[in-house]
Regions:
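Ser/Thr/Pro/Gly-rich low-complexity linker/stalk segments immediately outside membranes or between
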Residues: 36-41, 376-378
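Surface-exposed, low-hydrophobicity interaction/linker segments
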Residues: 35-37, 103-104
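Membrane-embedded transmembrane helical bundles of large multi-pass transporters/channels
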Residues: 1-35, 134-375, 493-685
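Structured non-transmembrane domains adjacent to transmembrane bundles in polytopic membrane proteins
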Residues: 45-67, 71-157, 374, 380-542, ...
Length: 685
């Protein structure tokens, strides 16, 4: 490695030029990376609902209704005018209202009340709209402009459009505040006014490279777009700081050596620690790649790539930048702003055993509670009632109740069997209406007598389409039970020869997919990190202690919603399990490394105090940065999935930090005879 680092130092101007060019190209590439805000797009291709949607899109021109629009204080003629105007909007492929089910020229009082009130109630008209995915942003905005602020719209298309528009501005706000905080914390923890700017420059270069190289994926998820950069900032913060501090140490130890020689020495001495730290983080992130739910691989690959690029930046760009600016660092040198943590170290040495006991007591209940949460699986609850979308959804449900749309595809022909299926589906209490050939044209009416535009919506491409309106949420026990019942009913008449699609159906498949991912992802993350530690430490007990400490922090973090009676987004639950392990196990590794170093010259208790004093600044810098980034995400994101992921990140960072600085010392103290190599050691006081 020394030869490589010597070459980097000698060609530092070329390195700076290459990174400057790469940063410019990355900025240009970032704008071309597409972001997907539809959570259902990340279902595995082989999931039943995904297959059903693909078959339906191949056979029919119209998709599944994905928006409900409520207009207040309108008459029937005015509602019909609104229907025509909505249908004329570019991107709207279909609009359904009362006139599609009943003859609205007949007085409504003389018609079926349930049918009428599904579309028109208390002077409010409810339209069921199908919006094309490619044009949903423009179409949703146009519908909003048409109906005005006093009316309401909700549905999957609206949720996706709102997420798209809000996340961009919110991420920019989070990033700006995070950078200011990181600058503040770096000013406190470094001894040069120039050093924080150098560290931020290096981090900025790595983040730009990661964002630009996301172009290789073509499209990234909204989770990756929102969390990727700020997570990279938080987990990579200490790499550059560590290198610069090593450089300062080498210059102080060998005052006669040139800055170039000191930098090569600093790189050689810091490579092992930085690489081991980065490797465990990468492994934790890569565990997400095994998820069938494709947001996992999407986020895992992007984060792992980000850490790798941060490491590349630290070992190439930062040496060149530091050598270009070290004179500026010398001129702006100042006394440390933070006090010594010696007293804190001695305090921890006194309380470490009780804290270790407390953690042992918490292990089992926190594990059980973390696995007993109630979950949201889909996108239905991503926006709370404090948002415009949440308020609109509540208003529509208050007037017209809940609603979802399922689409059943069965082979064309055999209208007698279709009629039997329709009759059976009508017996399901939650099914409030069915639009199909046998329901609207009649099983005895030949196809050639049905108008072409109507026929094309119901029969096409060898399939007959039955559109079910159901009184159900898009997720929850009731919704999932309904999906199972509809599937079982259709299975009776078309055994393994049908397709079922819909928002609730996709959410059911999401539940199936991501719950199956849980054990696999967690075991791989834990096993891989444990294996890396086993290879690094060359002993069994210490890796067990380190991994168990961080896993307990994860259990405590995920147990908090259980005790507060809150629902958890299962996607956030899965992601944080791997991310918290990968991002915070470094704290435990650093602590154990320094403890082993101090044990060469100090007794057990003194080594604990010295270790706490030595590492508190370092782990607090990274831990507090990650916590602030997480809490900012939780406070600013209107998307409740991203907000919850942020809060998990913030709480998890602080819990991991607290355990490493309070309970882990007690475990190391107790396990000392088994983890410290037998040497002639000082006698304990």
């Amino acid at each position: 490695m020394k030869r490589f680092y010597t070459a980097i130092v000698r060609r530092r101007r070329l390195v700076l030029a290459v990174f400057a060019l790469a940063a410019v190209l990355s900025m240009a590439a970032t704008s071309r990376v597409q972001v997907d805000y539809d959570i259902n797009d990340y279902l595995p291709p082989e999931s039943p609902s995904t297959t059903a949607i693909e078959v339906m899109n191949g056979a029919f021109t119209g998709g599944i209704p994905n928006m409900r629009v409520m207009v207040r204080d309108v008459t029937v003629p005015q509602a019909l005018e609104y229907k025509e105007k909505i249908a004329a909007i570019d991107g709207v492929s279909a609009v359904a209202w009362l006139d599609d089910s009943l003859d609205v020229t007949v007085p409504l009082q003389m018609q079926d009340t349930a049918t009428v009130e599904s579309y028109y109630k208390d002077g409010c008209a409810l339209f069921t709209v199908t919006v094309e995915d490619e044009k949903r942003l423009e179409a949703v905005a146009a519908v909003r402009d048409l109906i005005g602020e006093g009316n309401a719209l909700e549905g999957a298309a609206v949720s996706t459009a709102v997420a798209t528009n809000s996340t961009v501005t919110e991420v920019a706000k989070i990033a700006a505040i995070a950078v200011v905080y990181v600058l503040f914390i770096l000013i406190l923890t470094t001894d040069s006014w120039a050093e924080p700017l150098l560290v931020l420059t290096g981090l900025g270069a790595a983040i730009l490279l990661n964002n630009g190289t996301n172009l290789i994926f073509g499209t990234i998820s909204f989770v990756t777009n929102a969390a990727g950069s700020i997570l990279q900032l938080a987990v990579s913060l200490d790499y550059s700081v560590f290198l610069i501090h090593r450089f300062a140490e080498c210059r102080a130890e060998t005052p006669g050596a040139s800055p170039e020689e000191c930098m090569v020495d600093a790189l050689c001495r810091s490579t092992g620690s930085i690489l081991s730290s980065g490797l465990t983080t990468v492994i934790g992130f890569l565990a997400l790649v095994l998820m069938q739910f494709q947001i996992g691989p999407d986020l895992g690959l992007a984060l792992a790539k980000g850490v790798v690029l941060s490491l590349v930046t630290v070992f190439t760009f930062m040496p060149a930048l530091t050598l270009a600016c070290y004179k500026w660092m010398d001129k702006t040198h100042h006394r440390p702003l933070l006090p010594s943590f010696d007293k804190f170290g001695r305090f921890v040495a006194r309380i470490m055993l009780p804290m270790a006991l407390v953690l042992v007591i918490l292990m089992v209940p926190s594990y059980l509670a973390s696995n007993s949460n109630q979950y949201y699986y889909g996108a239905a609850h991503m926006f709370g009632e404090n948002t415009r979308l949440g308020a609109d959804t509540a208003a529509i449900e208050e007037t017209f109740g809940r609603s979802d749309t399922y689409v059943v595809l069965v082979p064309e022909g055999d209208t007698a069997t279709q009629q039997k299926l329709s009759d059976a589906l009508h017996t399901i209490p939650e099914v409030t209406g069915i639009l199909s050939y046998v329901d609207n044209a009649g099983a005895s009416i030949p196809l050639e007598f049905v108008p072409g535009d109507t026929l094309g919506l119901l029969v096409s491409g060898g399939y007959t389409r039955m559109v079910l309106t159901v009184d159900a949420d898009t997720e929850g026990d009731g919704a999932f039970a309904l999906v199972e019942r509809v599937r079982a009913t259709v299975q009776q008449y078309y055994p393994d020869n049908y397709y079922l699609a819909g928002q609730g159906v996709s959410t059911y498949d999401l539940m199936d997919t991501i719950t199956a991912d849980m054990v696999k992802v967690n075991l791989l993350a834990i096993g891989a990190v444990f294996l890396i530690l086993l290879l690094m430490k060359r002993q069994l007990l210490l890796p067990i202690i380190l991994v168990l400490s961080i896993e307990t922090a994860i259990w405590i973090n995920l147990a908090i919603p259980y005790f507060r009676g809150q629902y958890v987004f299962y996607i956030a639950y899965l992601i944080i399990s791997s991310v918290q392990l990968g991002a915070t196990v470094d704290y435990a590794i650093l602590f154990s490394d320094r403890y082993q170093e101090f044990r060469e010259t100090l007794g057990r208790k003194e080594a604990v105090a010295a270790t706490v004093s030595a590492v508190t600044t370092s782990v607090s810098t990274t831990g507090s940065a990650m916590a602030v980034v997480g809490f900012l995400m939780g406070a600013i994101s209107t998307n409740q999935l991203l907000g919850q992921l942020g809060n998990f990140l913030g709480v998890g960072s602080l819990v991991s930090l607290a355990i490493v600085l309070s309970a882990l010392p007690g475990f190391l103290y107790l396990a000392d005879p088994l983890i410290i190599k037998k040497k002639k050691q000082p006698k304990e006081a």
